[in-house]
Amino acid sequence: FIDYQTNEADWEQRKNERREQLSGLKNVQLKAMFPDMDGRAIYVRSEQEQKICFALSSLGVKFRYEEPYEHQLADEMHSQYRPDFSIYFKQGGVTKRIYLEHFGVDEHGLVPAWFAKDKGITYEEANQKYNDGITWKKAAHEKFGTQLLVTSSADFHYSDIRDKLRKLLAEAGVPIQEKTDEELYDLVLP
């Protein structure tokens, strides 16, 4: 005799524990200079994301960092998707939300060597895993018809990230309202 209800309950509990474990694996480290659109301090995972926060703030763009995606995507293998940046703006009197993902890859789609070292896997495995994640995120946006803007580490090497963001945002219809030095100074977090 097999008690399917007990097994199903155990399975649900294990799924929920796995989701919590997956979301806990992300290591938040660096504080951004400016708050998000709600006035809350932002803690990011890389210096490049920190610079993106600075650029978005200086361009007068309203955003939140790692806010849950508007569609439920959590499953046995994934915690709920949290795009790097959710960008909010008004268009025709309606609040719009688009997304910005920053991918830590070079112009060839390769991750830095330390990605593998930090996870104790081979460089090939690190590239495969990271690029699978990129593909999964892009597919989610395509499936639900949400707009995704993308930057990468290569953008920091081959262009000015602020100029790149200004161009991407303008193409997406996001109004730019550049902050003065005084306005930025007033926003600086302690």
Where are these regions (language model features)?
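A basic/glycine-biased coupling hinge at the interface between accessory DNA-binding modules
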Residues: 1-15, 19, 154-190
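Interdomain/boundary linker segments immediately adjacent to catalytic/signaling cores
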Residues: 1-43
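Nuclease catalytic cores
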Residues: 41-53
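A short acidic/basic microdomain associated with nuclease active sites
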Residues: 57-77
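Acidic-and-aromatic substrate-binding clefts and catalytic sites of carbohydrate-active enzymes
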Residues: 70-80, 153-160
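Short beta-strand-loop-alpha-helix junction that forms the active-site gateway
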Residues: 82-134
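Conserved catalytic segments around the Walker B and adjacent sensor/switch elements
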Residues: 145-152
